[in-house]
A protein has these predicted regions:
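Generic surface-pattern signal
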Residues: 51-55, 74, 83, 87, ...
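Short, low-complexity N-terminal intrinsically disordered segments enriched in polar/charged residues
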Residues: 4-55
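Exposed beta-sheet edge and beta->alpha loop/turn motif
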Residues: 99-130
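A short, amphipathic edge element
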Residues: 79-107
Length: 130
């Protein structure tokens, strides 16, 4: 009798643990599904930046950046860096998303393998929803 009670208790504990695992797995997947919208917005913003880069509209890129970036980087310095980047790397050719991460459903980190005419590199983009 004690043995049966032990096995029933053990079975009950295992079922509770499985339920908890399944619940948190489901919860995590729901959050990932909900994050797809902000990921797409972030990707669209990166596409916009690459388009502006190829057109040489660096001031537009600066204007799209967040306030903390503008506080840390003078407009003139940014424009100089971007002009130098174009001279060294060349025009943007293409990119492939390597990794993305959503933080608190408001911030997205995107890591791309980016191809330019002269070089290929990994670039990180951070999108913060206002």
């Amino acid at each position: 009798m004690k043995r049966n009670r032990f096995f029933l208790s053990l079975l009950f504990m295992v079922l509770i643990v499985l339920f908890v695992i399944l619940f948190f797995t489901w919860l995590g997947r729901e959050n990932i599904k909900n994050d797809s919208a902000i990921r797409e917005v972030a990707k669209e913003e990166v596409d916009k930046l690459f388009s502006l880069y190829n057109k040489g509209e660096y001031a537009e890129i600066y204007d799209l950046s967040c306030d903390s970036f503008k506080n840390a980087t003078a407009r003139k310095d940014f424009l100089t860096v971007m002009e130098t980047k174009m001279k060294i790397l060349g025009e943007f050719k293409g990119r492939k998303l390597q990794y993305s991460n959503v933080i608190n459903s408001k911030s997205v980190e995107l890591y791309y393998r980016v191809g330019y005419i002269n070089y290929s590199l990994i670039e990180e983009f951070n999108y913060i929803k206002n």
